[in-house]
UniProtKB/Swiss-Prot annotation:
This is Kita-kyushu lung cancer antigen 1. Glycans are attached at N83. Specifically expressed in testis. Expressed by cancer cell lines. Residues 22-113 are extracellular. The keyword Cell membrane applies. It comes from the Eukaryota. Residues 1-3 are cytoplasmic. The gene is CT83.
């Protein structure tokens, strides 16, 4: 009985380690054979090291990882940009309305970012 319990727990531990290993490989940007992401592959020693990060990840590798792991992120980013431009237009309308009504707290000079 104890032998079967030990065997089952060791198999379970092996499966968990294998699952974590596969998940780690997927998160580090290794492309699987069925990946359809359109990203250029450049060696990791590209020389584009971001000095602001503690773990010295390459900026190009991070963007490639994002494209590989989230191929729908480009469409999502485009939708976010469209929504942001709509919000910006609404804020300009609101600012114009407030200035035309004589609200003194609104600044006529907006800083663009």
């Amino acid at each position: 009985m104890n032998f079967y319990l030990l065997l089952a727990s060791s198999i379970l531990c092996a499966l968990i380690v294998f699952w974590k290993y596969r998940r780690f490989q997927r998160n580090t940007g290794e492309m699987s054979s069925n990946s359809t992401a359109l990203a250029l592959v450049r060696p990791s020693s590209s020389g584009l090291i971001n000095s602001n990060t503690d773990n010295n990840l390459a900026v190009y590798d991070l963007s490639r990882d994002i494209l590989n792991n989230f191929p729908h992120s480009i469409a999502r980013q485009k939708r976010i940009l469209v929504n942001l431009s709509m919000v910006e237009n609404k804020l300009v309308e609101l600012e114009h309305t407030l200035l035309s009504k004589g609200f003194r707290g609104a600044s006529p000079h907006r800083k663009s970012t």
